[in-house]
C-alpha cells in the first residue's frame, strides 16, 4: 500500500543504488557530483555510501569480487542510464563548462544539446561515471504525456 503523507509524490522513486567496481573512486566521484546537485551525505562507510534530499536517496556500494568480472555495460540487461533534473538550460550549460570539462569527466554525444524527440524543450548533457554508467543532467520544461498539465 502506498501512503500519501505530504508533498512526496506517490510512486516517486525513493532510492537508486549503484554497485561500483572501485568503491573509493566511485564514492569520491558521486560525493562531488551529488553535492553539486544539492544532495547531502547521509551515510558513509568503507564499502557503502548514501546521499539524499527530501524524498529520495542515491547509494553506491562496492561490488563483490565474484560479480565484477564482466563489468558494466549499459546495453546489457539492466539500467541504461540515470537522469537528474536541472532547473534551466543555463544550469546544464554551466554544469558542462564549470564541472564536467575541468574535471575531464567523459562527456557523451559532444556536449549539451536539445532532444526535442523526448519532449518539447528537452535539453541535456550526458556523461559517464568511473564504471562508465551513463548519467544525464536534463532540463525538461514539458514532460512527455503531460503537455497540458502544469509540470
Across the structure, where does each feature detected by a protein language model lie?
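Short glycine-enriched loop/turn motifs at secondary-structure junctions
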Residues: 10-12, 75-79, 119
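Glycine-centered tight beta-turn/hairpin loop motif at sheet-sheet or coil-to-beta transitions
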Residues: 55, 130-132
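Long, contiguous binding/interaction regions
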Residues: 6-7, 37-46, 62, 87-90, ...
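N-terminal beta-strand motif that seeds the catalytic metal site of vicinal oxygen chelate
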Residues: 2-27, 82, 141-151
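Core segments of cupin and vicinal oxygen chelate
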Residues: 17-64
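Short beta-strand/turn micro-motifs at beta-sheet edges
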Residues: 2-5, 66-72
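Vicinal oxygen chelate
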Residues: 20-25, 83-130
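Helix-adjacent hinge/juxtasegments
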Residues: 68-91
Amino acid at each position: 500500500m502506498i501512503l500519501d503523507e505530504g508533498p512526496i509524490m506517490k510512486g516517486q522513486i525513493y532510492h537508486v543504488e549503484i554497485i561500483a567496481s572501485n568503491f573509493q573512486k566511485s564514492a569520491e566521484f558521486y560525493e562531488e557530483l551529488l553535492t553539486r546537485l544539492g544532495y547531502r551525505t547521509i551515510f558513509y562507510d568503507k564499502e557503502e555510501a548514501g546521499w539524499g534530499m527530501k524524498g529520495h536517496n542515491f547509494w553506491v556500494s562496492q561490488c563483490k569480487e565474484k560479480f565484477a568480472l564482466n563489468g558494466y555495460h549499459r546495453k546489457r540487461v539492466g539500467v541504461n542510464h540515470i537522469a537528474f533534473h536541472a532547473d534551466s538550460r543555463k544550469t546544464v550549460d554551466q554544469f558542462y563548462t564549470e564541472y564536467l570539462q575541468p574535471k575531464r569527466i567523459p562527456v557523451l554525444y559532444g556536449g549539451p544539446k536539445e532532444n526535442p524527440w523526448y519532449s518539447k524543450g528537452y535539453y541535456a548533457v550526458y556523461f559517464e561515471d568511473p564504471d562508465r554508467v551513463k548519467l544525464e543532467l536534463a532540463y525538461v520544461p514539458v514532460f512527455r504525456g503531460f503537455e497540458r498539465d502544469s509540470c
